């Protein structure tokens, strides 16, 4: 598509966690650079001219973790969904700064267990996040999610 449509863009939204999948990376910068390298290799293999034009149309928004980081940011909506009046926060703020040993997905699973529920990413995450304001979540996830929301605002 990007080869045949000069207005097309490629938008990539990988998770930083787990690290070192596909290529070595432990930071968002390393993940971004690795994706760019792989993209350039594909352009070389296809003997594409004017690589700069294609690189400019590659947009990479590296989420640090799975979408569960967004669920941690959606405190009120998550708490209401779980039917809990009070929930002691036992994670790092900003939510994008969790560590790989205790990623947001594990934290969310524990929160669901405490409420007597089992977390199902496919069902529960959309039900919680659809009640959220994108910009409220973006303000809580400024490192990686906010730039993506800003990008979406520009292309809408």
Regions found by a protein language model. Give the residues of each.
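C-terminal accessory helical subdomains adjacent to catalytic cores in phosphodiester-
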Residues: 2-156
């Amino acid at each position: 598509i990007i080869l045949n449509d000069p207005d097309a863009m490629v938008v990539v939204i990988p998770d930083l966690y787990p690290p070192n999948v596909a290529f070595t990376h432990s930071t968002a910068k390393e993940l971004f650079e690795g994706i760019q390298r792989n993209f350039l290799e594909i352009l070389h293999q296809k003997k594409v001219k004017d690589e700069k034009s294609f690189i400019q149309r590659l947009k990479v928004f590296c989420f640090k973790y799975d979408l569960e980081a967004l669920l941690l940011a959606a405190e009120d909506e998550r708490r209401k969904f779980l039917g809990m009046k009070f929930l002691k926060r036992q994670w790092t703020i900003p939510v994008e700064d969790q560590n790989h040993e205790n990623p947001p997905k594990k934290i969310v699973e524990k929160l669901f267990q405490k409420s007597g529920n089992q977390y199902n990413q496919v069902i529960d995450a959309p039900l919680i996040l659809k009640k959220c304001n994108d910009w409220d979540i973006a303000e809580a996830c400024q490192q990686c999610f906010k730039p993506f929301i800003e990008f979406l605002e520009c292309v809408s």
